[in-house]
């Protein structure tokens, strides 16, 4: 009987212990994601796209407040409408990851800024902080943009990590007047639950594998020196009212729709939540290209007609599912 009890205790305690060790070991990788280099092939892909759309591209260098060098492109269409959209890619990606978004925005007359996030692509920076430092990076990008361009309105669009960054950036900098965010994380703790639950069973990350969540976040906070609890798009949208179009992919197992639903519930400004049927993580544009373009362009057009700084007074938007 005692032997059975010992075996039961071992079986009960082994998974949490293993999770704690795994979380501790995974911490550095969370801050130092795999870097997708900006290869010559990717540059040629972008150049071909810009040639087809008849746009002009120039290199854009911005120094962040911590002196990290951020690299990207400023791209203008043939007939610019005077509005600019800042595009933000996902984790372990680079600026070419949002090329598809840039194409339809440029065709619609929007100029775009495509930057490699810190610790991604060709940009500098010792680590990714998922919005903590990236918020001030975004403000530096806007400062540099406004020093050479006269923007009627500045909007932002991001996916995954980039979605979380744009939501936190817009809360910190009112020059960003409206945001489209696909597959954002609600906060780092919720994202860690999904990570610890093997991106399929978040309840495991909150129960049996909870020690993995705790050790991962604790080690990252010590390594990076910022409060992980404050890296929260959910808190950001509650701190400042601004228009937001949230897009979540129905079959997303990396950042399930509950993240976008939490952000939607917290948002104080005009808001819309679009659940894209059958779509996987950050795949809404691929699954429903026409509807994606229609919704995003309609959203930005609604706020392009407002006087600068007056977008929060526009009508509130609704929650939706699928096409309409």
Q: PLM features: residue spans?
A:
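The serine-hydrolase catalytic nucleophile loop
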Residues: 91-104, 117
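Conserved alpha/beta-hydrolase
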Residues: 104-124
